[in-house]
Amino acid sequence: MDTRVELELEPVGKQDRLKDQPDDENEPLENQLELEQEHKSLLTPVKIPPAQTASPDQEATPSTPPPMSLQPGTSRQLFRDAAMAHGGQETTSLLQQELNNIAATQTPASKLRSASSTLDASISRNPSTTGGKHEKKLGHRRVAEGGEVTYKKIQSKQIMGSIQLGIQHTVGSLASKPKRDLLMNDFWEMETISFPPDGSSITPAHHYNDFRFKVYAPIAFRYFRDLFGIAPDDFLMSMCASPLRELSNPGASGSIFYLTTDDEFIIKTVQKKECEFLQKLLPGYYMNLSQNPRTLLPKFFGLYCFHYNSKNVRLVAMNNLLPSDIKMHCKYDLKGSSFRRKASKAERQKASPTFKDLDFAEHHPNGIFLETDKYNALMSTIKRDCMVLESFQIMDYSLLVGIHNLDLAAKEKREERILNARAKLQRKESAAQGPPSLNPDDDAPEADQNQLQAVASYASIPGTSAGAALNRTRSMNRQRLVAHSTALESITADMDVPLEEDEDVPAGGIPARSENDERLILYIGIIDILQSYRLEKKLEHTFKSILYNGDTVSVCRPSFYAKRFQDAMGKQVFKKTPTFPLKHSPSKRKTSTTQLRSPASRLPPLSTPTNAVRQPIMTMSGMSTPPPAFDDISEEDITAASTSSLQQQRSSNQSNNNRGETEVALREGNNTRGGSGEPSSTYHTQYSYDSSGRTGSALTSDYSDDESTGTDLSSRLPKLRTHRLTKTSVQVTTVGYVEGVDTPPKGGQDVVHADVNGKTTMTTTTMLTTTKTAHIQAPSYTSTLVLNDLPR
């Protein structure tokens, strides 16, 4: 009895369990039939038995998938054939059929459903299977299939037009208010204006949806614009006169960039945390700009918020670092770190990629060379800006470097000119092969060939290109709206350097050289300064320091980041141009620049009586005052010296010959009267320094180390010297000297000499003459120095 009850109860429980089982097992088959019907036109006809419907008789038996009429491997072959017939694309139905056939005999139904759902999800994310409707998303920025850009699901065109309306209203209304001193409350002031489509008493009508526009610290930003010399009318003309241009290359955070038509300002979307941090930064930012407006930090001119459809889009207006009318051959985002600081493959494939620190080390292993004054000005500016950022606890900023290669640009223009000339020649040759014209010109192809050769030869000259004069005129006449906005203005105040007439050099950049001696123009600035060292960044640094080297990651404490940033910029990125300074002579006295640049004043007239006897002249044609420093010698002086030396060569040679004859005659006369001695002639070279501009005390201090035999320099009589000086950059090195023979005079001699003023004086003295002849050798000449030491 009990056994019967158990037998009667078992089917009841079994039926309850089997009522739900057929539906679950038949669900994959139903999905398969639906998918096959959808793609019926794309599939090869395959005979598949219809799905069996569940019946009460079948419920009692264990449910198994219906056997397929396909032989093992037949479905796989059909799958390949269908895939090849459709260009090798794996359709959804074929994938589903293959998966069901394999999993029906090997996996349970629950695992089959999970695998099919995963496949559907993966295929739905594939743009090739969804008809290309997949959107590219980076942050809040999305790009649809047709190229339409949205930010927070708001069209970019609506954002652009709305902020132009808001800026036009706020700046215009603020211009009517009188100017006053900036107060602390002005940094926290906010103003909100509603813009209905039909307009209001203070806002114009527009074709956009209803939105609100918020302005942060309008009076404070007006002060910043005045500090950089931006008039309200000019700011409105730049922002609102024409539609803004959207940059196609967004930042790493997915921000949207708008550029004004005149290339002066750029508007960037920022996050809420960055907007709040900039508000807190405004008082310190104001203090820094008041003390030093020449900085590489971003120059902010406005902070706004666009509110539409319960979403806020925050934007900041600032100066544009990279002019769009100048081609940037390379762009670098440098932080001084090395961990994952290499551009990705997707970034490298862009038309204008932005490289990073490791890429810069590969492209410029020895860095970029700057002149000494430019290097010092740049590094002092970076040091000061890093100190300001460190005081605000800011890190993770970077230096944006845009490089314009002048030599490469000239080469590209030359190639373009040659291609244009060849295309013109080909067109004329093809026209000549056609029907003859009324006035045929047989010399036209030859003339075009000559023109092509002329273009090639003209283009080979450095600094010449098509439109160079026009571009140069634009660069020289174009006055930037924002003061101190260019890279050169940001680091130095010397902006009065004229451009060369034969060079097409863009204005505003910093001149530099590569290790291959290529001419470069740099456009630099510090960006991304709205990242503070908050708790999130501290945790990121701690986590990365555990896994990797903490000194190489980008995120670190502000003090260490500033030091690492300065070291990388000053030692790896930028370097001084290697120079070879001239070695000075042993003189301790430095000749003033005024004396060096007035050689005409060094030739006072000499008046000597005709019958007077002159004593031997102490000629110092080899030793001189120290050569001036490299910076003291201007190009005009060197050019003037080189040209005047050719004109004075004949006259100087004649005068030197006359002087030599006179000196020999005088010395022979002295030897006849007072004693015997060997006559010594003085040789003057064209390239020599003379110490005629110095006094006797200077000579005593300069040459006090020279040897003398029984002489006292303090008892020397006034001597006459040849007043000659020709500037040169040749380094003179003393090799040695030959000491002469002491010749005592037989008696006293009367010496008639003339001073500088022309007065004659006769002095009787007993002299012991010691002649020292020093041979001075230089790379390009050899001169002789004669010194006469007098006894006490």
From Swiss-Prot:
SMART domains: PIPKc (SM00330). Residues 52-62, 105-131, 678-702 have a biased composition (Polar residues). GO terms for biological process: apical constriction; basement membrane organization; cortical actin cytoskeleton organization; dorsal appendage formation; endosome organization; epithelial to mesenchymal transition; establishment or maintenance of cell polarity regulating cell shape; follicle cell of egg chamber development. Interacts with ash2 (via B30.2/SPRY domain); the interaction is direct and seems to be specific for ash2 isoform B. Its EC number is 2.7.1.68. Catalyzes the phosphorylation of phosphatidylinositol 4-phosphate (PtdIns[4]P) to form phosphatidylinositol 4,5-bisphosphate (PtdIns[4,5]P(2)), a lipid second messenger that regulates several cellular processes such as signal transduction, vesicle trafficking, actin cytoskeleton dynamics, cell adhesion, and cell motility. PtdIns[4,5]P(2) can directly act as a second messenger or can be utilized as a precursor to generate other second messengers: inositol 1,4,5-trisphosphate (IP3), diacylglycerol (DAG) or phosphatidylinositol-3,4,5-trisphosphate (PtdIns[3,4,5]P(3)). GO terms for cellular component: apical plasma membrane; cell cortex; chromosome; male germline ring canal; motile cilium; nucleus; plasma membrane. It is a peripheral membrane protein. Residues 155-573 form the PIPK domain. It holds the Pfam family PIP5K. It is found in: Cytoplasm; Cytoplasm, Cell cortex; Nucleus; Chromosome. GO terms for molecular function: 1-phosphatidylinositol-4-phosphate 5-kinase activity. This is Phosphatidylinositol 4-phosphate 5-kinase type-1 sktl. It comes from Drosophila melanogaster. Keywords: Cell membrane, Cell projection, Chromosome, Cilium, Cytoplasm, Flagellum, Kinase, Lipid metabolism, Membrane, Nucleus, Phospholipid metabolism, Transferase. PANTHER family: LP03320P-RELATED, PHOSPHATIDYLINOSITOL-4-PHOSPHATE 5-KINASE. The keyword Transferase applies. Residues 642-658 have a biased composition (Low complexity).
